[in-house]
Regions:
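Charged docking surfaces used in two-component/phosphorelay signaling
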Residues: 15-23
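Active-site residues of response regulator receiver
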Residues: 52-53
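His-Asp phosphorelay/catalytic-motif detector in bacterial-type signaling
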Residues: 45-47, 73-78
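Short hydrophobic/Thr-rich beta-strand motif most characteristic of the beta2 strand and flanking loop
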Residues: 25-33, 40
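The C-terminal output helix
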Residues: 115-130
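Hydrophobic/aromatic residues positioned on beta-strands within the core alpha/beta folds
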Residues: 80-82
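Short amphipathic alpha-helix used as the core "switch/output" element in two-component signaling
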Residues: 39, 62-75
Length: 130
């Protein structure tokens, strides 16, 4: 079972994404606070991080991403950034994120991106929802 950490300051989005990912067989941890991301990354050891670009509390998603990518212990964790702003190519490249998806997103698109980034052989099989 692949572990995914979801970071978003919108608790409704956190709850929806958590339910979706659990239905697809992922082990999920969520946090609404950017500053908690580092501690949860250490304790949960996620195989992928799904994170909002703009967080209202604590550190911004771009700052967190850049810090995680510059840390030798976390630099290889794929990070998919998401935002309601669709013109985010520059922002996610600057912070060295691995991918970007615009909100609102289709479940099939989200799962496809997750599968793509977990397909390096370290992730367990992803099951589909019936």
């Amino acid at each position: 079972m692949s572990r995914i950490l979801v970071v978003d300051d919108n608790k409704d989005i956190l709850q929806i994404v958590e339910i979706i990912l659990k239905n697809y067989g992922f082990e999920v941890m969520v946090t609404p606070n950017g500053e908690e991301t580092f501690a949860k990354t250490d304790s949960f050891n996620p195989e992928l991080i799904l994170m909002d670009v703009f967080l209202s509390e604590g550190l911004d998603g771009r700052v967190i991403c850049k810090n995680l990518k510059s840390n030798p212990q976390t630099k290889n964790i794929p990070i998919i950034m998401f935002s309601a702003q669709t013109k985010m190519d520059d922002a996610f490249h600057i912070c060295q994120a691995d991918d970007f998806i615009a909100k609102p997103f289709e479940v099939v698109d989200l799962i496809s991106k997750i599968k793509q980034h977990l397909s390096n052989g370290t992730a367990s099989a992803i099951t589909s929802v019936n």
